[in-house]
């Protein structure tokens, strides 16, 4: 298995995995994923084996310290030399859940963001996943300003 960045040819596969992982109101559409890949392919980390993508993480870089709903929809808010790596999705293909795939990709994202000189990483998650992200050093900052998909999210931050 290897971790690589996204290519335009990956969009359909990524959209399928996203759709299988989130309710439609929460997950990114194929069009949204295509827009993100076009603007910041290096902010997609894909775990693949052969031609099969098992998991991926994506999000952009910004100087804004908090994750907002607008960030999900506008890839042009990406600031390549920004201070914070945002994470929008941490997803695993259904056939590969509970194999440690998402953890492996997330560890790589953390290492890459630190090596790039970012201040840290910000993501939002549902309350039931706070413990999962805490094991990587993320701290729960409480309920997020984001109401993406009409869901209550917790903002988690890993500061380097």
Regions inferred by a protein language model and the residue ranges of each:
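Active-site rim helix/loop that mediates acceptor-substrate recognition in acyltransferases
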Residues: 23-50, 56-77
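Conserved acyl-donor/pantetheine-binding loop and adjacent beta-alpha core of acyl/acetyltransferases
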Residues: 56-91, 97, 146-153
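Conserved acetyl-CoA-binding loop-helix of GNAT-fold acetyltransferases
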Residues: 92, 98-111
């Amino acid at each position: 298995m290897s971790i690589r960045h996204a290519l335009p040819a990956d969009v359909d596969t990524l959209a399928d995995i996203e759709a299988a992982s989130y309710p439609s109101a929460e997950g990114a559409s194929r069009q949204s994923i295509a827009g993100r890949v076009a603007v910041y392919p290096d902010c997609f980390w894909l775990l693949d084996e052969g031609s099969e993508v098992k998991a991926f993480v994506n999000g952009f870089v910004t100087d804004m310290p908090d994750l907002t709903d607008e960030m999900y929809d506008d890839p042009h808010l990406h600031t390549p030399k920004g201070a914070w790596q945002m994470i929008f999705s941490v997803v695993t293909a259904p056939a590969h859940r509970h194999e440690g795939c998402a953890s492996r990709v997330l560890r790589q994202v953390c290492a890459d963001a630190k090596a790039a000189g970012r201040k840290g990483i910000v993501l939002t998650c549902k309350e039931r996943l706070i413990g999962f992200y805490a094991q990587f050093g993320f701290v729960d900052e409480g309920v997020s300003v984001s109401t993406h998909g009409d869901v209550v999210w917790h903002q988690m931050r890993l500061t380097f």
